[in-house]
Amino acid sequence: MAEVKVPELAESITEGTIAEWLKNVGDNVDKGEAILELETDKVNVEVVSEEAGVLSEQLAEEGDTVEVGQAVAVVGEGQVNTSNDSSNESSQKDEAKEKETPKQSNPNSSESENTQDNSQQRINATPSARRHARKNGVDLSEVSGKGNDVLRKDDVENSQKSSSQTAKSESKSQNSGSKQSNNNPSKPVIREKMSRRKKTAAKKLLEVSNQTAMLTTFNEVDMTNVMDLRKRKKEQFIKDHDGTKLGFMSFFTKAAVAALKKYPEVNAEIDGDDMITKQFYDIGIAVSTDDGLLVPFVRDCDKKNFAEIEQEIANLAVKARDKKLGLDDMVNGSFTITNGGIFGSMMSTPIINGNQAAILGMHSIITRPIAVDKDTIENRPMMYIALSYDHRIIDGKEAVGFLKTIKELIENPEDLLLES
């Protein structure tokens, strides 16, 4: 017998939530094989077994919060012949547990409910499917499988989605026939638990707002020259760098590095009574995912060329959306860039990332009339840029100077190429 424990994660992570069991009780487990997926404050990680054998016990359920070092499963010796057998065995164990658990008497209970409970027990389903059904009030007798003898968690989830869509359509048809009074307090709402990562993000954003003297300064950038350079070099860049595309993000990343070198206080953070000025340039690139906004870091941007930065950004974006980011991708950065322009944002005041002094916000490129000199007005592609910064560390003069440096480098992109 060997216990599987939650491994040491990043220094700041002490616990996580079991997102999904990847193995059921009775399943064969190889050494180094993942048995569950753990959701942490930053990324999802897989917990693996250090021993080969059979998963004999799950010590926590999906949705439970577990601490680093806590035992979550037991792997014993032996083998199971088929996956169906293991699922049947685990289902029988669940069934036995349910029979052993005394039910509280309820004067309102009916024979039909008891019949439903018994039918739930007779149905062959994996433990995770049963738990999910109990948690969400799904009747397993109404769940259709995928041709297997055993109902699995995804079968229950698919049944939920189908029921939800039916309920929505029924609700719409009912509402179309009658209007609720504006004074009626029972308006339709949907209440659901926030994911661990969503709760953590909400907590940290509030902490940053409350614990920093955050201020935002703005400028505008004429994107004419950088767009022209990108257009001229785009095809050759793709050929020279194995299909890597030249985007605007690499220009802003290199401009940020140059500005950070010129204004080192922007690359700093406060630690107690000390100010730590970082001598490295790990730039966070905000990526939107189904789980919310994630900020993986491109390491050593001062040592990377445009192609390497673009490749790294593309790789991190794919990993973020596929939930494959590691903890090393998400910690110990020095500065962050976020681009609300991809969603159509014209202007915003981004919130500083934790343990940093500032964040740069990019926005939509909008063609508008600009006075290029006192006698000439031309339509130019313009972008508003924003720098939110911690006024405890950075004075207004430095913040404005930093943003002005970004502006000048983007408007004269050849200077960035020379620096690279």
UniProtKB/Swiss-Prot annotation:
User: Region Disordered: what ranges?
Assistant: 75-201
List every position bearing N6-lipoyllysine. K42
Q: Report the GO terms under cellular component.
A: cytosol; oxoglutarate dehydrogenase complex
Entry GO MF terms:
dihydrolipoyllysine-residue succinyltransferase activity
Tell me which domain of life the UniProt entry assigns to the organism this sequence originates from.
Bacteria
> Which cofactor is recorded for it?
(R)-lipoate
Instruction: From the UniProt record, list the reaction(s) this protein catalyses.
Output: N(6)-[(R)-dihydrolipoyl]-L-lysyl-[protein] + succinyl-CoA = N(6)-[(R)-S(8)-succinyldihydrolipoyl]-L-lysyl-[protein] + CoA
What positions does the domain Lipoyl-binding occupy?
Answer: 1-76
The pathway it acts in is: Amino-acid degradation; L-lysine degradation via saccharopine pathway; glutaryl-CoA from L-lysine: step 6/6
Q: Per the UniProt record, which EC number(s) apply here?
A: 2.3.1.61
Query: Domain Peripheral subunit-binding (PSBD): where?
Result: 124-160
Active site positions, chain numbering: H391, D395
Q: How does the cofactor attach, per the note?
A: Binds 1 lipoyl cofactor covalently.
Provide the alphabetized UniProt keywords: Acyltransferase, Lipoyl, Transferase, Tricarboxylic acid cycle
Comp. bias regions, Basic and acidic residues: 91-102, 149-158
* Annotated Polar residues bias: 81-90, 103-127
What is one GO biological process annotated to this record?
Answer: tricarboxylic acid cycle
Q: Does the keyword Acyltransferase apply?
A: yes
EC top class named in words = transferase
CDD domains linked to this entry: lipoyl_domain
The family line of this record is: Belongs to the 2-oxoacid dehydrogenase family.
Reported function: E2 component of the 2-oxoglutarate dehydrogenase (OGDH) complex which catalyzes the second step in the conversion of 2-oxoglutarate to succinyl-CoA and CO(2).
Listed PANTHER family: DIHYDROLIPOYLLYSINE-RESIDUE SUCCINYLTRANSFERASE COMPONENT OF 2-OXOGLUTARATE DEHYDROGENASE COMPLEX, MITOCHONDRIAL (PTHR43416:SF5), DIHYDROLIPOYLLYSINE-RESIDUE SUCCINYLTRANSFERASE COMPONENT OF 2-OXOGLUTARATE DEHYDROGENASE COMPLEX, MITOCHONDRIAL-RELATED (PTHR43416)
Q: How does it assemble?
A: Forms a 24-polypeptide structural core with octahedral symmetry. Part of the 2-oxoglutarate dehydrogenase (OGDH) complex composed of E1 (2-oxoglutarate dehydrogenase), E2 (dihydrolipoamide succinyltransferase) and E3 (dihydrolipoamide dehydrogenase); the complex contains multiple copies of the three enzymatic components (E1, E2 and E3).
Protein name, entry field: Dihydrolipoyllysine-residue succinyltransferase component of 2-oxoglutarate dehydrogenase complex
> What species is given as this protein's source?
Staphylococcus epidermidis (strain ATCC 12228 / FDA PCI 1200)
GN (gene name) = odhB
